[in-house]
Amino acid sequence: MKIVALQASPRKGGNCDVLMDEMIRGIEENGGEVVKYYLEKEDIAPCKACMYCAENPECVRADDGNKILDELVAADGVIFATPIYYGQMTAQGKLIIDRFYSIGQNPDKSLSGKAALIFTENQPEGTYEEYINLTKFSPFTFMGYEVIGHVDAGSAGPAGIVAEEQPKKLEEAYELGLKF
């Protein structure tokens, strides 16, 4: 089993990263293999709506986005982790998700398998429940993933504080990793 982990937080070692590492631990303990991408470090250009992908096997952008999309197509599932900034996912996360369009345009490619989502925000848990539910269904379910669950850690401020103040969230992430 191969899982692609997309870390959309620009903060390595931050709360999303800590939770993702716990989820990865659960997957690896079950014999799974995980390829983790820090989207902040990848060269991913935005979709320019040129429709090149409707006529060709991949996006016109010659960047790391195509490599990641190919990994997603070949994988058995995905973990997507993002902090909530001003009520939405980070720009780093949105860049790769917008590029899902090129897969949807190609009849030889599809996204499938299991998906697990991680959200952190510096607001009380539940503040962004509507947004989280919307994100679970669009684009992940829309593109063909079975969303098996999510971890939402509210009141997650300084980097790594979730490990100290919300150890149950680490357990949730680990347990969700075992479900892959």
Question: Which role does the model predict for each range below?
Answer:
Residues 1, 24, 29, 139-180:
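Glycine-rich phosphate/pyrophosphate-binding loop and the adjoining helix
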Residues 1-32:
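N-terminal beta1-alpha1 ligand-phosphate binding loop
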Residues 51-55, 98, 166-168:
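Short, hinge-like loop/turn segments at secondary-structure boundaries
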Residues 6-8, 39, 118-122, 153:
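Cofactor-binding loop segments of dinucleotide-utilizing enzymes, especially the Rossmann-like FAD-
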Residues 42-69:
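Cysteine-cluster motifs in flexible loop/terminal segments that predominantly coordinate metals
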Residues 32-42, 151:
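A short beta-strand-loop structural module common to alpha/beta enzyme folds
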